[in-house]
């Protein structure tokens, strides 16, 4: 199990990313825009750098919904590989069965 503080930190990152999403997209559009002047681009870069670090979506980490485990995460189920196996063996995931050949 992951520490509660790590799970809470991840929740804060998601909230910050949602809060600053529009502002971040506007600034990136100015930076990558062909019609923007160099001065406007530079000011947009400075504003982008002044945003909170955790507001960047790339700082988010996929974690297991049950345990908070960051590695072995399966997006389809929202669980780690260990929890997917446990729930599949109990038959709690519809349509998923153990492979045999």
From Swiss-Prot:
PANTHER family (UniProt xref): 30S RIBOSOMAL PROTEIN S14, SMALL RIBOSOMAL SUBUNIT PROTEIN US14M
Function text: Binds 16S rRNA, required for the assembly of 30S particles and may also be responsible for determining the conformation of the 16S rRNA at the A site.
A Pfam family the protein falls into: Ribosomal_S14
Taxonomic lineage: Bacteria, Pseudomonadati, Pseudomonadota, Gammaproteobacteria, Enterobacterales
Protein name per the record: Small ribosomal subunit protein uS14
InterPro entries in UniProt: Ribosomal_uS14, Ribosomal_uS14_bac/plastid, Ribosomal_uS14_CS
GO molecular function: rRNA binding; structural constituent of ribosome
BP-aspect Gene Ontology terms: translation
Subunit details: Part of the 30S ribosomal subunit. Contacts proteins S3 and S10.
Biased composition (Polar residues): 52-68
Family: Belongs to the universal ribosomal protein uS14 family.
Region (Disordered): 49-70
Keywords in alphabetical order: Ribonucleoprotein, Ribosomal protein, RNA-binding, rRNA-binding
GO CC field: cytoplasm; small ribosomal subunit
């Amino acid at each position: 199990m992951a520490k509660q503080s790590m799970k809470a930190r991840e929740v804060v990152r998601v909230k910050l990313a949602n809060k600053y999403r529009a502002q971040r997209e506007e600034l990136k559009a100015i930076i990558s825009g062909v019609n923007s002047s160099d001065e406007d681009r530079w000011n947009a870069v400075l504003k982008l750098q002044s945003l909170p670090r955790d507001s960047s979506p790339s700082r988010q980490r996929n974690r297991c919904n049950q345990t908070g485990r960051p590695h072995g995460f399966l997006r389809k189920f929202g669980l780690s590989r260990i929890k997917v196996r446990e729930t599949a063996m109990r038959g709690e995931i519809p349509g998923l069965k153990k492979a045999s050949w």
